[in-house]
């Protein structure tokens, strides 16, 4: 499957009916440094009206997917519009200027990037096809590489700096080509954001955990129709064991399909043991 690059964990908490509540990333501005303009601080304590949690860019990058009725409670027009308003007010207050946002920290961040991450995480979490929400199915390998869900996922990943490291635009283009789907069917607008600015905690139900994502440090290869683990290993100079381990394939390689995005790293000289 396409996401054999990464091992994901699925949020599997089921909540009873919830009303949208106001959530703030920061309850007050006491922790902000003096570098942050007083006039714009209120923008960062914006009341976001979603369920009783926010899904951050870090959550989805670490493999979090909403399941059960969490999806329908979070993926609402009210939540989307509230995050959108938060995004607009933050951009209006701070633009693209970076600040030393927190006391006792010299790291300079663009406040708007944090909110961009919330909108990107919303769009990723709320991808749907005719059968329902997609993200959990993509993560647990029940959606095929050329499915509507996976192609929508690719477009959202390529649309932001938060997703491009795991799913670069050239990989998405190769996937569309291998699926014989025109790029015009899955267009996206790129929003440049610095992934280091995403909040570490979002308030997503704490009893659900996500498996940390392992990032590919090499290159990405798109499997072709006649590829096997052996042929890829030889052509890309990676041991078969390493190929299987990094991409979470089964050792018989039966899960390898055309269009699968594979991480190729720690190259070596491959030698196939001959008889005698």
Curated annotation (Swiss-Prot):
For this protein, the record's InterPro entries field holds: LysM_dom, LysM_dom_sf
As given in the record, the signal peptide range reads 1-22
| Matching Gene3D superfamilies | LysM domain (3.10.350.10)
Q: What happens when the gene is disrupted?
A: Leads to enhanced fungal virulence, with faster decaying on infected fruits.
Q: Where in the cell is it found?
A: Secreted
Key words, A-Z: Chitin-binding, Glycoprotein, Secreted, Signal, Virulence
Q: Which residues are glycosylated?
A: 27, 104, 140, 267
Q: Which Gene Ontology CC terms are recorded?
A: extracellular region
Task: Check the record and name the SUPFAM superfamilies matching this protein.
Answer: LysM domain
Q: Which GO terms describe its molecular function?
A: chitin binding
Residues forming the LysM domain are 219-264
Main location as per UniProt: secreted
Q: Where are the transmembrane segments?
A: none
| Additional facts recorded | In plants, chitin acts as a microbe-associated molecular pattern (MAMP) that is recognized by lysin motif (LysM)-containing plant cell surface-localized pattern recognition receptors (PRRs) that activate a plethora of downstream immune responses.
Task: State the protein's purpose.
Answer: Secreted LysM effector that might have a role in sequestration of chitin oligosaccharides (breakdown products of fungal cell walls that are released during invasion and act as triggers of host immunity) to dampen host defense.
The free-text domain note is:
The LysM (lysin motif) domains are small globular domains involved in binding chitin in eukaryotes. LysM10 contains one LysM domain.
Please give the family membership noted in the entry. Belongs to the secreted LysM effector family.
Name the record gives this protein: Secreted LysM effector LysM10
| Gene that produces this protein | LysM10
